[in-house]
């Protein structure tokens, strides 16, 4: 933090971008290995977030402190305005809710909270099988990254709060 403000406006300025038309993406869903690729991507996402969380926790323990704020921003996303983090409740997971995700799902583009709240959010990988089963029972056989994060918070009693932060994926 510099002057109590996290500056994120410089986080993503690509030199080039490859645009994949939605029709091409939709056709990919018909490919025979699509499901296994998607599951691999989801597992990789949760594993990577968990590993980053472990590094953060090791640093906190080694230096005998807890971060006031932990911010998780997807590397391909760009916040469209400055966020004054100290205005928000750090005991909950705050997230960009401007997409109005259904069923209480938690958008995974920009998420932040105190060390404890984000520890639960970022540790979803450790409980994926149990969380998937809960999601499948509650949502008719379906689950998603957004649902898994929500269920992890529910299991550990961590609240979540959407905010109208506009976060874009520059490739779209």
Language-model segments: which ranges?
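ER/Golgi luminal nucleotide-sugar-dependent glycosyltransferases, focusing on the catalytic module
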Residues: 1-172
């Amino acid at each position: 933090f510099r002057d109590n403000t996290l500056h994120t406006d410089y986080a993503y300025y690509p030199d080039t971008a490859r645009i994949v038309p939605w029709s091409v993406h939709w056709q990919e869903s018909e490919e025979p290995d699509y499901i296994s690729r998607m599951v691999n991507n989801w597992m990789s996402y949760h594993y990577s977030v968990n590993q980053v969380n472990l590094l953060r926790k090791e640093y906190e323990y080694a230096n005998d402190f807890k971060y006031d704020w932990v911010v998780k921003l997807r590397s391909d996303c760009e916040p469209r305005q400055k966020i004054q983090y100290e205005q928000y409740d750090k005991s909950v997971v705050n997230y960009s809710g401007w997409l109005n995700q259904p069923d209480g799902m938690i958008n995974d583009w920009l998420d932040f909270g105190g060390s404890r709240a984000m520890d639960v959010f970022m540790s979803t990988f450790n409980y994926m099988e149990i969380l998937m089963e809960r999601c499948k029972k509650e949502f008719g056989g379906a689950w998603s990254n957004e649902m898994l994060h929500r269920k992890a918070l529910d299991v550990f009693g961590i609240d979540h709060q959407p905010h109208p932060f506009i976060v874009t994926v520059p490739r779209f």
